[in-house]
């Protein structure tokens, strides 16, 4: 399907916080309770609609283990959005957020949109990190924040889509250079075809949109 833009995402955070489960819930609308540890990087994609335009999200799910950190760093470059995930039932995953955030900001473009996600909100009885703590961390570091449950799908759609909306707004404001794919944004055939139809009223033969 033709799209106006392609946005590249990266999902980061400690091992076991539910990164792969969030991706699977968003792309396939299913929950897999037992999931093998991600080795290196996994990939998923889905089309969404923002402001009447088709947007393709290309999502890279990274390994949380320290031994794979150098691989993860290479994927920060060329990402327009990042989902930084912790587990609300494990205080240590929240404590490690600063390290993940510093890593992301050091190796990514300065305009990358970061969504902080407190996952496993369905396990309220085992909560170790208050929602207010997540909100405060997000405020302090200029992040968007949501709590989600990959198991029940609560706020999963919203987390991915709200990140895309923020990226789209930055495009409209001219913050992102959309002609530089290093920013994690690619102009699609739908966008090119729309511009071509606006730019020519001479009745001449127009070339069709290319494929990507």
Swiss-Prot record:
Annotated effect of mutating residue 65 to L: Constitutively active. Interacts with GARIN1B
E.C. code: 3.6.5.2
Activity regulation info: Regulated by guanine nucleotide exchange factors (GEFs) which promote the exchange of bound GDP for free GTP, GTPase activating proteins (GAPs) which increase the GTP hydrolysis activity, and GDP dissociation inhibitors (GDIs) which inhibit the dissociation of the nucleotide from the GTPase.
Motif (Switch 2): 63-72
InterPro entries (alphabetical): P-loop_NTPase, Rab_GTPases_membrane_traffic, Small_GTP-bd, Small_GTPase
Sequence segments annotated as region (Disordered): 190-212
Binding site for Mg(2+): 20, 38, 61
The name this protein goes by in its record: Ras-related protein Rab-2A
Native species: Mus musculus (Mouse)
């Amino acid at each position: 399907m033709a799209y106006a833009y392609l946005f590249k995402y990266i999902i980061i955070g400690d091992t076991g916080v539910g990164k792969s489960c969030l991706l699977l819930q968003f792309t396939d609308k299913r929950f897999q309770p037992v999931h093998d540890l991600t080795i290196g990087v996994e990939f998923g994609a889905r089309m969404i609609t923002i402001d009447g335009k088709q947007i393709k999200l290309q999502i890279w799910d990274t390994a949380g283990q320290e031994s794979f950190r150098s691989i993860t760093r290479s994927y920060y470059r060329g990402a327009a959005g990042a989902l930084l995930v912790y587990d609300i039932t494990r205080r240590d995953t929240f404590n490690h957020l600063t390290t993940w955030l510093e890593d992301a900001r050091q190796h990514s473009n300065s305009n990358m949109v970061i969504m902080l996600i407190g996952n496993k909100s369905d396990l309220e009885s085992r909560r170790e990190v208050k929602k207010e703590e997540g909100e405060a961390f997000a405020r302090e570091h200029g992040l968007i924040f949501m709590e989600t449950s990959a198991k029940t799908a609560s706020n999963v759609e919203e987390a991915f889509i709200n990140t895309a909306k923020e990226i789209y707004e930055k495009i409209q404001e001219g913050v992102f250079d959309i002609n530089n794919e290093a920013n994690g944004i690619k102009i699609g055939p739908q966008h090119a075809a729309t511009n071509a139809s606006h730019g020519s009223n001479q009745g001449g033969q127009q070339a069709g949109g290319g494929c990507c």
